[in-house]
Amino acid sequence: MKETLKQKIIAELKNRITGDFDLRDEKDAKGNIQIWLKLFNRKDILHVAQVIKDFGGRCVIISAYKKDDHHVLVYHLDIDGILINVEVELFDNTVDSITPILDSANWTEREFKEMFGIKLVGHPNPKRLFLDESIAEGILGEYMPLSQAMNGAATCCMWEKIESERHKNEH
């Protein structure tokens, strides 16, 4: 049954995506199906989101990271237990919001906007979730690589740098 659903999802993705893309699917040792999709036209994320919605799916989370001189987003989407991972490179640091299509993307889009300074086009509620308005968007990426932040080794130092920068901007 999941195999049939996977084939329908893949067919619909191929039908709706307008730009170039790479697509592969795999099944792990426990039988979990994953679809991996790399979009070369960032606008196609809207078509993918519509496919997910049409199949009754949701946005689980969106990962953001820095690659060379630009950001990359990986959308982790779910349709009835089938995980669809969609990679989009942002060479202009801008992406269309999928929240108007998939409300489940709301907070995770706002989080990457705030933490990485990625510009969201068309988000219905782009207010911040965590950082005070006086702190610049994307500031965390300027002071500390994610790998250091994740191990918690330098949290105090990071916040000291952010507070110092904020106080400089106030004067």
Over which residues does each language-model region extend?
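Terminal low-complexity/charged segments
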Residues: 1-171
